Amino acid sequence: MEQVNELKEKGNKALSAGNIDDALQCYSEAIKLDPQNHVLYSNRSAAYAKKGDYQKAYEDGCKTVDLKPDWGKGYSRKAAALEFLNRFEEAKRTYEEGLKHEANNLQLKEGLQNMEARLAERKFMNPFNLPNLYQKLENDPRTRSLLSDPTYRELIEQLQNKPSDLGTKLQDPRVMTTLSVLLGVDLGSMDEEEEAATPPPPPPPKKEPKPEPMEEDLPENKKQALKEKELGNDAYKKKDFDKALKHYDRAKELDPTNMTYITNQAAVHFEKGDYNKCRELCEKAIEVGRENREDYRQIAKAYARIGNSYFKEEKYKDAIHFYNKSLAEHRTPDVLKKCQQAEKILKEQERLAYINPDLALEEKNKGNECFQKGDYPQAMKHYTEAIKRNPRDAKLYSNRAACYTKLLEFQLALKDCEECIQLEPTFIKGYTRKAAALEAMKDYTKAMDVYQKALDLDSSCKEAADGYQRCMMAQYNRHDSPEDVKRRAMADPEVQQIMSDPAMRLILEQMQKDPQALSEHLKNPVIAQKIQKLMDVGLIAIR
């Protein structure tokens, strides 16, 4: 047994020095002499993992568990190898099995948490939570017109808050169109084989994680360093930061190759509010970690802490930069959420910083000049810039709506009119321009309603009175073909929703077969409202 211990110690020293092949030879010779020694298989598993031979690391991890089923380290070795092999579900189960035997084993707990995080990453990411969601939808002509429909926005919010509903919504063509825009692929053109294809396996880890240390067989200096770290952790929890720093500093002196002791020091300075020192130590820790091939998760934590320090100082651009560095090393939900939060704050800050009413007025005047010359596209650009400079000026939206109407972009005109009315409910132009857009779309019933609202505000408004009369006459004299009526009606998002409702389709079929059923259905105010809408657009008529 003395020879076995000598070979084991020799292997440990070789592994610590980075001489992996020598370490493997020592452990293998020791195993020949003592094939039932579980520690030897555990150590050799660590050596194989460090070499990158993860299959053999896994086999030795399994042997360790077989020889000593109640030893947490064996499960840790086996799970780590499975993780390297991208067999995340099996790794998770192995960590869970190990915790049944050693419920308080920190390595197993941390390993399980990391596995759960990585498995969460592999699930389908919800595209409806993109930070620039509405900008993407606005920029694409396939979804731009849908945004004016309140039911569409409700649908988007529902899928943002409850992505599990996506499967039940795929029959809605609007959802498929939206996914095509957000994912940048034409889902409608994918053939069955493409749709049924399984996703490609994830790429191998970008950096080789460092195998876990062999607690029982660590050199004396590393054992002492771990003890100092624990003392430092106890002091840190008690907020005795000076004492914690002393212990972490001592641990670093004993084991200068372990970046954890430096990041722990950085954590103390973070709590003390000394963010410059915190960042300096994190950078040093990353340097040490790179030199010693540290686990990429530890590198990611150091970058995330730098990001957090900038976030605390409200330097969101710098925070985003380091959060992205952290995510490039290892993606975790917490850091991703923090990065998105910083991006949202920064975007709002930039928007507010851009506001300048004086420059907005200049752009508005330029837009007016272009509009009078008939250069509507250029006028629209000036009004858009003016809105960015002063987004609370209702008249700017009204002016841009006039441009959109001239350019026959009626849905966008309606959207701007709605914004104008919301900002300034008593501004007549907001109503008359909205009504004009509806009139141009030949939606005379809605147009008359809006003209009437303008007249309610100012009964002497000639533009509203004339518009109301025009719409009334047009409605009376229209002789559209059934195809024209149907095409125009189905362009209305509200009508689309009504006609895609299975219950409403059943009611309409009943009305065709049994006209007497109408009176029963009209007792329901919701159904009555929908039937009235279909009558208004000319899709149905009641005789």
UniProtKB/Swiss-Prot annotation:
Pfam families: STI1-HOP_DP, TPR_1, TPR_11, TPR_12, TPR_8. The modification Phosphothreonine is found at T198, T332. The modification Phosphotyrosine is found at Y354. Residues 191-233 are annotated as: Disordered. The modification N6-acetyllysine is found at K8, K301, K312, K325, K344, K446. The modification Phosphoserine is found at S16, S481. The TPR 1 repeat interacts with the C-terminal of HSC70. The TPR 4, 5 and 6 repeats (also called TPR2A domain) and TPR 7, 8 and 9 repeats (also called TPR2B domain) interact with HSP90. SUPFAM superfamilies: TPR-like. Keywords: Acetylation, Cytoplasm, Isopeptide bond, Nucleus, Phosphoprotein, Repeat, TPR repeat, Ubl conjugation. Acts as a co-chaperone for HSP90AA1. Mediates the association of the molecular chaperones HSPA8/HSC70 and HSP90. Residues 205-233 have a biased composition (Basic and acidic residues). In vitro kinase assay failed to detect phosphorylation by MAPKAPK2. One of its GO terms (biological process) is cellular response to interleukin-7. This is Stress-induced-phosphoprotein 1. GO terms for cellular component: cytosol; dynein axonemal particle; myelin sheath; nucleus; protein folding chaperone complex. The modification N-acetylmethionine is found at M1. Residues 130-169, 492-531 form the STI1 domain.
